[in-house]
A protein has these predicted regions:
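Hydrophobic alpha-helical membrane segments
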Residues: 18-142
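Intrinsically disordered, low-complexity peptide-like regions
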Residues: 1-4, 26
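Sec-dependent N-terminal signal peptides
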Residues: 3-14
């Protein structure tokens, strides 16, 4: 968990001094990391810490559009950017927190079973393109 908290704090501090698109990208990545850390802590048995981190994640998700003054016509781009960045980073952040291999997928959820049918290089390819799209959307539309 320590491996992820330092970059998360770094993103928060640097994000406040950036242009709007870069700040939105950093905010989304930080929120995704927060959720992944919370899920990993919950699965490790640290329920109180996990609940606190999940509550913080919900607050950041709800407050994001107000912080960045997202207009109605920008809302879809904002949501899509978050979705693509979440697909790119969530599993990796979760796995780093739990000390698992970075491209590891479990076997319990439907998502895990579907992703396990894709070879590792295919998963890396999908997550890489998702990262490119997730970063490109705020740069183009904000």
């Amino acid at each position: 968990m320590k491996n992820l908290l330092i970059p998360l704090l770094f993103i928060c501090v640097l994000g406040s001094a950036q242009t709007r698109p870069i700040a939105i990208i950093g905010y989304h990545i930080g929120t995704v990391a927060l959720g992944a850390i919370a899920d990993a802590q919950f699965d490790e048995g640290n329920k109180n810490l996990a609940h606190m981190l999940h509550a913080t994640e919900v607050v950041t998700l709800i407050s994001g559009p107000f912080i960045f003054d997202v207009k109605r016509n920008e809302a879809l781009a904002y949501i899509l950017s978050y979705g693509f960045l979440r697909f790119s980073f969530f599993d990796s952040a979760y796995n780093l927190t739990r000390d698992l291999p970075i491209l590891f997928n479990g076997s319990t959820s439907t998502y895990d079973r579907v992703m396990n049918t894709v070879p590792e290089h295919g998963r890396a390819f999908m997550k890489s393109w998702s990262l490119v799209v997730g970063v490109s959307i705020p740069i183009k539309y904000f």
